[in-house]
Swiss-Prot record:
Belongs to the L-aspartate dehydrogenase family. It catalyses: L-aspartate + NADP(+) + H2O = oxaloacetate + NH4(+) + NADPH + H(+); L-aspartate + NAD(+) + H2O = oxaloacetate + NH4(+) + NADH + H(+). This is L-aspartate dehydrogenase. Its EC number is 1.4.1.21. GO terms for biological process: NAD biosynthetic process. NAD(+) binds at residues 123, 189. The keyword Oxidoreductase applies. SUPFAM superfamilies: Glyceraldehyde-3-phosphate dehydrogenase-like, C-terminal domain, NAD(P)-binding Rossmann-fold domains. The active site is at 217. Gene3D superfamilies: Dihydrodipicolinate Reductase, domain 2, NAD(P)-binding Rossmann-like Domain.
Length: 266
């Protein structure tokens, strides 16, 4: 049985706890931490875990894996401390890995400790095919993400865009994955997953659509294998419209696979 520690007790952590209770994961949540203690207390209504008051204390528990569900800013600390305490780690706030220096640092720490960093596929499809294609040559990776205006509201306000003036599908960003994750840190983690899988930086376009009711991700990858095209329209989580249900399911599936005798997919 997988012994799990969770850092960040929000929507995804709650869905993991429910999946364990429904026997979809052969595991148990041993320890929890959130900088807002009330969130840890709320999540612990679904578990029988130890509530820790720091990341340092959580990583010292007897765990097989630590799941980061907190924020991009927390990734370096969570991953570094988990790996150095001989724990595998899952990074949900994968946007942090757009930082090349941090990526290289965590790669080395994981390698030195003979542990793994897991990056779930998140809210997109085709990651297995793209990883496989990267064995050959990939020439181009592009992502067009369309989201409801309310799902992008915080980032748009930070850019000085008045969302009340958006009355039709509007391109609010076009550029590299590196700039995309800086301007939309809570909305475009999938672009970093795509870039890691393909090993080349994705070209990103973000569209705010006032009529949209789901998050849509269109991916085109071209290379020596030909062309890969995928389109996913994700329903949001009921409890948090900024989180796609598929993103939460991807980490649940990953945890399930870690204890499965047969694993399908690359």
């Amino acid at each position: 049985m997988l012994k799990i520690g969770i850092i960040g007790c929000g929507t995804i952590a709650t869905m993991i706890a429910k999946a364990i209770n429904y026997k979809k994961i052969n595991g148990t949540i041993v320890a929890l931490y959130d900088k807002h203690n009330d969130k840890s207390q709320d999540l612990n209504k679904l578990t029988n875990a130890k509530i820790c008051d720091s990341i340092d204390k959580l990583v010292k528990e007897e765990l097989d894996i630590v799941i980061e569900c907190a924020s991009i800013k927390s990734v370096e600390e969570v991953a570094t401390k988990s790996l150095n305490h001989k724990k595998n780690v899952v990074i949900m706030s994968v946007g942090a890995l757009a930082d090349k220096n941090l990526f290289s640092k965590l790669y080395k720490i994981a390698n030195d400790n003979e542990k793994k960093i897991f990056v779930p596929s998140g809210a997109i499809a085709g990651v297995d095919a793209i990883k496989t294609a990267s064995i050959g040559r990939i020439d181009e990776v592009s992502l067009i993400t369309t989201k409801p205006v309310y799902g992008l509201e915080d980032a748009l306000k930070n850019k000085g865009i008045d969302t009340t003036n958006i009355s039709e599908p509007t391109v609010v960003f076009e550029g590299t994955v590196f700039d995309a994750i800086k301007e939309f840190p809570q909305n475009i983690n999938v672009s970093v997953v795509l870039s890691i899988a393909s090993k080349i930086p994705a070209k990103v376009k973000i569209v705010a659509d006032p009529s949209a009711t789901s998050n849509k991700h269109e991916i085109i990858v071209k290379g020596s294998i030909g062309t890969i095209k995928t389109v996913v329209e994700n329903n949001p989580c009921k409890d948090n419209p900024k989180t796609s249900a598929l993103a939460a399911y991807s980490v649940i599936r990953l945890l399930k696979d870690l204890s499965e005798p047969i694993i399908v997919g690359t």
